[in-house]
Structures are given as C-alpha cells and as structure tokens.
Amino acid sequence: MQDTEHSTIPGASLPIGLRGIAYYVGSSVPIQELSCLANNAELLERFKAAHFRNFSRSDISLPEQAAHCAQATLNKCGMQAGDIDAVVIGFSELREWTSYPEQLTYAILSRLGMNHIPVVGVTLAGCANVTSSLRVARNMIMVDGYRNVLVVETNLLRDDRRRLEGTAPGATPENVFGDGAVSFVLTRDNDTADFDLLAMDQIVSYTEGEQTTIQDVIATSTAASRRVIGRALDQAGVQREQVKCVLLNNMNILMMAALFRLYGFTHADFHIENTLRYGHVWSADSFINLHDYCETRKPLAGAHFLLIGHGNTYYSALVLRLRHSASDAAQAN
C-alpha cells in the first residue's frame, strides 16, 4: 500500500462555520432498469443485499442541477448572490461532451446571477471530491480573507451503461452511481453557521501491482479509511462515543459498515437510508445524508458528526459539530 499525506491543521485552528446544506437529486429509478442487472438475477440480489434499490437519474443538465441546489442554499441562508465572495465548483464525473468546463462554470454562475467573482474548479478526488472542495473553500477564507464561500458539487452520467462500477479491473460491480448535486456555504461568521468545521483529513491510497485482487483493494481501502477517521477524530478532540452519527457515502455499504464496526460503531450509528433511494451520488452522499438525518431526527445542538468520503483511491473524513438544534432555529425565526 502506498499513500500520500498532506499536513493537517488541528481542529482548534479551524474557526470556520458551515451553513445552508441543500441538494438536488434526479428521479428515483429502480436498479433493475439497468440491463446488466435485469439480465442477471444473482447480481441484482447482491446489490439489493447491499442496500441498493434505486438510483437517481437527472432530467436536467449538470449546471442546472448545480444552480438549483445552490439557489436553495442561498435561500436557506437568507443570502443574495452579492453576499458570496467566492465560489468553489467540484466535478467528479464530467459528461457534458459539448461543453468545456469554462462554459459549464458560466452556465452555473449565470443562473445564480453571479458575476465578477473568484471561482475555483476542483476535480480528480472522486468519492472524496467534496472534501477537496471544502478544503479549498476553507483556505480561501483563512488565507485569502474571504467571508462567505459557496461550495457546489455536481455530477451526472449521460450513459446508464456506466452506472455500475467495480472496485478493481475486471471485478464485479460494487455500486450504482446516481445523478445529483449538493451545496453549502463555508463562512467566517460562526454565529450564523449551522455547523462548526472541527477537522478534516484526506489521503490517496492505492494497491500496486498488476495482479491486484478485490481482497487487496478491500484491505487497502479499510486501512486508508481507518487512518483518516482516526486522525480526523484526534484533530477534533472527539472520542468515538461522542459521535452522534456516521454519515457514510453510499459506496459499498456492507464493506464500510464492517469497517466501522471495528471502531465500535453499530448500525444504529449510521444513516444509510438514502442508499435505497438515490444510489451512490458520488462525493455528495455524506452531505445529503447529513441533511436528511438532521431534518428527520432533529439532533440537539452540540452533536458531533463524522462524514466519510470512501472511494477507490481517495479517502477523507470530516468532523462537524451542530451549533443550533431545530428548536433553536424555530425560536430564532
């Protein structure tokens, strides 16, 4: 196993808040509509056993779904386009073959009424890409002095034949990709934030050699995820027992659930219901799951959340702390 580490900043030095999580997903489509599953009953049952039932298929364009959820974020924050100092746009899968990324950026920002504003594009990190986008936004606040940075992560597949993907060359597919986008604002104004960003960690880790097996990949993935989880919790000064919920991304739930049991987490600590509805919406999963968990469970202020980005090569962990409970927000309004 080889991994690449980057220096991390202790949670205490992250005076950054996060607010206004919103998301867009496409229509929920049964996984048996995918021809390779419709014609393979054994594989179909394997996916159902791994909590996959449906995937999200977008009926709007990549920039439209990004702008849709970004506008929802602004509305939740009570903000206008002019309140945003910079934008970070993340893509993991670029399938708008008729457009250059620059044109897609214009298509997103023009829908939001944003002009003359710094924009950074972030890609490459796959299922951990939203963490890369968040890291860039945090640095823009801490280093460049911006106050409010809008983060948008958007992905869409035009070809249903590519929705199933294995974790190693020639391996049996392990997840079903869905279309969707997620957005939020990273802010220096902590008093207005929904969450405190306490810590983040992210590494590249892969198995070398031409004879890589699925067992090798699982071993590498497990070690990498355990590493970033442990370091993020240490940076945040948070014990496992203090974590209210683990927000998994929806890739290979069975493997990740087994991994987290090594830490002493139980099924009750996970929020994985969205896997049944959306499939694996790339790196947006954990924030979508966090949004829905807080909407349905109404956790109290001070609750800690562990968000996981678990991919084939990139792995990340975030620790957030809820600043205001649902009752607090209701009283404020």
What is the meaning of each model-derived region?
Residues 1-62, 163-231, 310, 319-333:
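Condensing-enzyme catalytic core mediating Claisen C-C bond formation in acyl metabolism
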Residues 8-11, 112-114, 141-144, 174-178, ...:
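Solvent-exposed alpha-helices and their adjacent loops that cap or buttress functional pockets
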Residues 39-44, 99-113, 151-163, 256-267:
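Acidic-glycine-rich active-site phosphate/pyrophosphate-binding loop
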Residues 67, 94-101, 115, 122-142, ...:
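Claisen-condensing/thiolase-fold acyl-transfer catalytic domains that form or cleave C-C bonds
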Residues 69-85, 226-244, 263:
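Phosphate/pyrophosphate-binding loops at sites that engage ATP/ADP/AMP, CoA/4′-phosphopantetheine
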Residues 81-96:
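Membrane helical hairpin/interfacial module
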Residues 86-88, 110-122, 165-169, 266-273:
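Glycine/charged-rich beta-loop-alpha catalytic/anionic-binding loops adjacent to active sites
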Residues 140-175:
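Flexible, glycine-rich active-site loops centered on histidine and acidic residues
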